[in-house]
Amino acid sequence: FDKACRLAQLSGVTTVMLTGKGEPTIFPSQISSYLEALKKYNFPLVELQTNGLLIRERDSSGNLILENALKMWHQLGLSMVAISVVHHYPEHNRKIYTPHRKEYIDLPATIKYLHELGFSVRLSCVMAKGYVESPEAVENMINFARQQGVEQLTFTPVNLPASAIDPDNHDAYDKHWVWASDNMLSSKQIKSIREELDDMGVRLMELSHGAIVYDVRGQNVCLSNCLVVKPDASELRNLIFFPDGHLRYHWQFSGAILL
């Protein structure tokens, strides 16, 4: 891990994101350990990607189970909490994130609580059919983010992995590939959303991997992408440290390995 951090530091990395293939807040002590290890490298921006479900979860005594951890993480340098969503409607988010529950979390209250603890908040909205799939839905999501005082809002369309086979389970057909195939937006839909953002907002920057950052009536908005390979790019998009000690630069391809 130290070697990965040193390489990131030498490469001019400014942002560290704690994330995973599962939900990181299930393992709060692990987050604390990584933040402790990161502290000596003094990266300017440290972020946590989460579904947000445990942020305001209470135990049987009514205590917030992550309150002390969140306060510690903030002291250790965690600056941004990015919450994954598919919409601002609770029922839409419930279908994806808590289908086993009757209700989704109170998202506005979660955002407010994180702000009270001193964190900035990003909503990372995955665009999919039946959810955020049109310019109108994008504008409504932007209005919601502005009303909640969200610092950053990112739109990322569902993208199709290169293979229908899970590389970790060669005998199983990858159900996530099937879901992505059935729910990804068309190129026409994405184009119309980009054109709407160009009309509504001001382009602030275009990142090397193709993401575009806008100011839309005072709201920071990023139209991003995922699972994109740009072999001719002059810089890496990611340096990804895996728990097994390997350092990679792409989530999807096992051949994208540095250490």
Question: How should each PLM-predicted stretch be described?
Answer:
Residues F27-S33:
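Active-site-adjacent beta->alpha loops and helix N-cap segments on the catalytic face
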Residues S11-F27, Y41-N68, W73-L107, S120-V126, ...:
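Core AdoMet radical
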Residues F1, I31, L66, L107, ...:
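Aromatic/hydrophobic pocket-lining residues that form the small-molecule binding cavity
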Residues Q30, C226, F253-G255:
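Residue-level structural signal for beta-strand termini and adjacent loop
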Residues E91-I105, K112-P231:
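Radical SAM enzyme [4Fe-4S]-AdoMet core and its adjacent flexible, acidic
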Residues Y34-L38, I111-L114:
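Hydrophobic positions in alpha-helices of CheY-like receiver
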Residues K230-L259:
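Radical SAM enzyme core and accessory elements
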Residues D2-R6, L35-E36, L64-G77, E139-G149:
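Short amphipathic alpha-helices and their capping/turn segments at secondary-structure boundaries
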